[in-house]
Amino acid sequence: MAEQVALSRTQVCGILREELYQGDAFHQADTHIFIIMGASGDLAKKKIYPTIWWLFRDGLLPEDTFIVGYARSRLTVDDIRKQSEPFFKVTPEERPKLEEFFARNSYVAGQYDDPASYKHLNSHMNALHQGMQANRLFYLALPPTVYEAVTKNIQEICMSQTGWNRIIVEKPFGRDLQSSNQLSNHISSLFREDQIYRIDHYLGKEMVQNLMVLRFANRIFGPIWNRDNIACVILTFKEPFGTEGRGGYFDEFGIIRDVMQNHLLQMLCLVAMEKPASTDSDDVRDEKVKVLKCISEVETDNVVLGQYVGNPSGEGEATNGYLDDPTVPHGSTTATFAAAVLYVENERWDGVPFILRCGKALNERKAEVRLQFRDVAGDIFHQQCKRNELVIRVQPNEAVYTKMMTKKPGMFFNPEESELDLTYGNRYKNVKLPDAYERLILDVFCGSQMHFVRSDELREAWRIFTPLLHKIDREKPQPIPYVYGSRGPTEADELMKRVGFQYEGTYKWVNPHKL
C-alpha cells in the first residue's frame, strides 16, 4: 500500500476554496459585512477575531469582506488588535496578510439599547464599499440580558435592504424552558428561522461531525447500533481545571446548564438519531428533534451532583476548592460535577441507559462518546472476556477505537483485550484540523444550518432538564464533595454500575506508533 502523502495547508485550503466557489451557497462575488456585537469582550478577543483572521488568511472568506466591531467601550481598531492579536498565532510570513486583514476592520462605539447608536452603525456600514447592498452577518457575543434590545434594533435599523441578513446567537439560550421560549419567541418575531444561527461550538468539533459519517457511511455499524447489542452509552466531558477566579459567572448557571443540557445532549442526538433523508440541514435536525421527543424528563433518582474541594496534597490551584474562589458566593451549592441517566423510549433504544457525565477539576481533559456492547452469548472462555466498546474521542487527540478481544500472542490460548485504533494524529499526519468556530462561522457564510440548534430542538432540550433544574434551584441540595484532580464522586460510578455499565479497570491502551 502506497504511503499517503500529506497535503500542505495551502493545498487543503485550495481544494476547499475550489469546492466553495463551485457551490451555489457561497456568494464569493458579493460584499459581506461581519459585525461583532460585543467586540470588546473575551469571546470576541479569544475566539471570534482569531477565527475570522484564520478564515481570511486561508482565503476562505469572500474577497470583499469587511469586519466591523461594535461595543460600548470607546476603542479603536488598534485597541482591538492589541487585545486579540496574541491569539492569532501569526507567523512572520503572514505579517503582510495580517496588515490586509486589519485594513478591512473598523470599530463603532455605541449603546446596546439606543436606536441612535444603531443608526450610526448602519451609516458606517452603508459607507463601506457596496455597503448598502452587502450581505450582513451579526455575531451576538453578548450576555443574553441584552439580546432583546440588540436584536430589535438590528432588525429595525441595521438590516441590509438587498443582501441577506443572518444573526449568530451564543449560548446560554435561556436558563430554563420558560426563559428560553421567551427569548426564542422574541427573536423569531424579528427574524426567520433560516436567518437565526444558535451556535453550540461542540457541533463544530471534528469527531462530533464524524459521528454521522461513521454511522451512516459504514455498513458494519448499522446492524449492531440498537438495544439488542448495545448495553449502554456514556457521553463524557471532563476538565482538569476549576473556575480559577471565574466562578461568579459559572455560579449563575452550574454544570448542567453549562455543559450537559447542550453539548452532551447534542452528542446524544447524533448517536441515537435515525438516518436522515439527506444531509440537508432540516432533514438532519428533524431526526434530532425526534430523538429528544422520545426522552422523558430526567428523574432525580438518576442524577448525582458534586462540587470539588481542594486537594491537600495538590499544588497551586489544585489546593483550592470551588468555594475558595473569591468570585463564588459564600456557601454556594452550585454543582461543578453532574452525572445523569436518560432513556430514549423508542424501538431502537428502549431500555438502554444514556449516561451523561461532566465536571470541572477532574483527573484529565477528555470528551468522548463510549458505546459499551452486551456480553457475548454462550461464553466458552470461562468468563475471561470483557465487553466490546466503541469509543469516539472528541478531545484531546481525536480518535476512533474499538476495544475487542484477541488471542494472547504466543503459546497461550487465552483471550486478551486489544484495540482497533484510528488516532487522527497518526493516520492524518500534518493535517491541521480546523477550530470548531472556523467550521461554524464558515457554515454561516455558506448558509448551512446543519450544525446549529433549531428552535424546536432547543425547546425539547430544556423540557428534559427544566423540572430537575427548578428542583435544584428551589431545594438547593448539598452537592457531594470530590477532591480536585479525582474522577469525581464515587456515587457517580455507583449510579453507572446500577444502570448496567461494567467498568473492568483491566484495559491499558498502548500507542502502537510509540512501540
Swiss-Prot record:
Disulfide bond positions: none
Keyword Metal-binding belongs to the record: no
InterPro entries: G6P_DH, G6P_DH_AS, G6P_DH_C, G6P_DH_NAD-bd, NAD(P)-bd_dom_sf
Location within or outside the cell: Cytoplasm, Cytosol; Membrane
Gene Ontology MF annotations: carbohydrate binding; D-glucose binding; glucose-6-phosphate dehydrogenase activity; identical protein binding; NADP binding; protein homodimerization activity
Reported modifications of this chain: Acetylated by ELP3 at Lys-403; acetylation inhibits its homodimerization and enzyme activity. Deacetylated by SIRT2 at Lys-403; deacetylation stimulates its enzyme activity.
Binding site for D-glucose 6-phosphate: 171, 201-205, 239, 258, 360, 365, 395
GO biological process: angiotensin-mediated vasoconstriction involved in regulation of systemic arterial blood pressure; angiotensin-mediated vasodilation involved in regulation of systemic arterial blood pressure; cellular response to oxidative stress; cholesterol biosynthetic process; erythrocyte development; erythrocyte maturation; glucose 6-phosphate metabolic process; glucose metabolic process
Modified residues (N6-(2-hydroxyisobutyryl)lysine): 171
Active site feature: 263 (proton acceptor)
Modified-residue entries (Phosphotyrosine), positions: 503
Pfam family, one: G6PD_N
GO cellular component: centriolar satellite; cytoplasmic side of plasma membrane; cytosol; intracellular membrane-bounded organelle
Sequence positions that bind NADP(+) 1: 38-45, 72, 147, 171
Topology in the lipid bilayer: Peripheral membrane protein
Keywords recorded for this protein, A-Z: Acetylation, Carbohydrate metabolism, Cytoplasm, Glucose metabolism, Hydroxylation, Membrane, NADP, Oxidoreductase, Phosphoprotein
Entry similarity comment: Belongs to the glucose-6-phosphate dehydrogenase family.
Function: Cytosolic glucose-6-phosphate dehydrogenase that catalyzes the first and rate-limiting step of the oxidative branch within the pentose phosphate pathway/shunt, an alternative route to glycolysis for the dissimilation of carbohydrates and a major source of reducing power and metabolic intermediates for fatty acid and nucleic acid biosynthetic processes.
Remarks, miscellaneous: Has NADP both as cofactor (bound to the N-terminal domain) and as structural element bound to the C-terminal domain.
Protein name: Glucose-6-phosphate 1-dehydrogenase
Classification of source organism: Eukaryota, Metazoa, Chordata, Craniata, Vertebrata
